[in-house]
């Protein structure tokens, strides 16, 4: 196939296997003419592995474009009705 359409391809996997799945997808898509469209709710995975994104809230598109543009603090606040950056930093600080 030249196009993979995936719905949460690493859902319920341990972290090691999530990384392996996305590393395999990244290698597969490097060949010319190939593309991947994937639903991913894990923002860290989307940011690490995605190139373009569509951010939705209540069935409507809020933003689409490069991952960096789409996953901005302002867009995420609209999508999640909270400061995602603050929450994720708080969660990460537990590991430091």
Protein language model regions, located:
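Helix N-cap at the start of a conserved alpha-helix in ABC-type nucleotide-binding domains
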Residues: 15-17
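H-loop/switch region of ABC-family ATPase nucleotide-binding domains
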Residues: 40-41
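A short, surface-exposed alpha-helical micro-motif characterized by mixed small hydrophobic
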Residues: 46-48
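Helical segment within the ABC ATPase nucleotide-binding domain
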Residues: 19-31
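Catalytic Walker B motif of ABC-type/P-loop ATPase nucleotide-binding domains
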Residues: 4-8
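ABC ATPase "signature
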Residues: 64-65
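ABC ATPase nucleotide-binding domains
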Residues: 73-96
